[in-house]
């Protein structure tokens, strides 16, 4: 990936994971650039298919583009940071991320509400630096 494209992804996201919203400065593991539609699914390495992701979100997401929603009994696409509005699909309930079907499935597949991730967000909330504005 060329440096200019990498810089675009970082600046567009303002150094914040585009899935869980945790800023890089509070995560000891370097963020990664995620192919929203994985290369193995013929997703291009282009600005409209790339998102900044923390290691955990990117690792959990893998090549997935959808998940099964137990509430609607339907296969639902994962949140796409280039096409979907974060605030339409997600909302914070304290340190836990909740959402409508796309948000709910994304939270599940990316394991966004795992205990260690909630603990980090609680600490950041207590310090007054989360969620990002």
What does each of the following model-derived ranges do?
Residues 37, 54-56, 101:
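Residues at the C-termini of beta-strands that transition into short coil/loop
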Residues 3-4, 23-26, 59-133:
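Extended charged
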Residues 2-31, 51-61:
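Short cysteine-rich loop/turn motifs with clustered Cys
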Residues 37-50, 82:
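Short linker/helix segments within small regulatory modules
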């Amino acid at each position: 990936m060329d440096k200019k494209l990498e810089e675009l992804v970082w600046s567009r996201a303002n150094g914040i994971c585009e899935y869980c919203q945790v800023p890089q400065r509070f995560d000891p593991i370097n963020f990664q650039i995620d192919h929203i539609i994985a290369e193995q699914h013929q997703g291009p390495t282009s600005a409209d298919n790339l998102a900044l992701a923390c290691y955990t979100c990117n690792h959990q997401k893998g090549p997935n583009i959808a998940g099964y929603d137990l509430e609607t009994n339907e296969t639902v696409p994962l949140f796409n940071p280039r096409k979907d509005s974060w605030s339409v699909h997600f909302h914070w309930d304290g340190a836990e991320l909740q959402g409508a079907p796309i948000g709910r499935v994304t939270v599940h597949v990316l394991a966004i509400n795992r205990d260690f991730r909630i603990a980090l967000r609680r600490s950041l909330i207590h310090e007054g630096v989360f969620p990002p504005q």
